[in-house]
Amino acid sequence: MELIMSNIATGLRSLKLNALTNELLYAFQADILEFRTTFGLGVMTEFTTVDDDLHTSLITEEMKEYGEAECHVDRADALVDSVYVLMGRYVHQMGTSKEFSYSLTPILYMVDILIQTSNSFGYDFKACWDNIHASNMSKVCKSEEDAQTTVQSYLSDDIDTDYRQVGDYWVVFKNGDSADIKHGKVLKSIYYTPADLELVLYGTV
């Protein structure tokens, strides 16, 4: 077992990040911290099997969307969303710490590969990220009435949800597992503002 773990550690040290610069990493960490704090999600807290299942289902969903993408807008959206999910897993465990963690290196390696993939298509990854982050922040409900209306909207689609207050906001989330949505996933407010990657990629709508 010690030999196996030693080989794994050596392998992690040999991973080279080509596209994920420190500047990008720290910017991603700050944005994800804002998201997770606003929505009452864990930051540097115990990472449970439930958390692991949720994060895994989210990245699986995004990679499926990437595989099904038929245009640059959908492809860029799936790539950035995938990095957003992976950074969520990372910040859950590391916060905005600049200390290096070999155990979490595979996450950063996956992030790096996704950014390189984005670059290969000529996308401005950071501009796409900023647009999607702003959109993700709009998922929060600004009043309890908005949260209740959002819950009713999901109920009309037979999606069981609930909401909780976090600071000055209310967050709607999936209540219980379903075939394609895990319990605890943050859901969009009815006043959610979709990302506009058409504008980012082409400068037009």
Predicted regions and their residues:
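Flexible "arm" and connector segments at domain edges
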Residues: 2-205
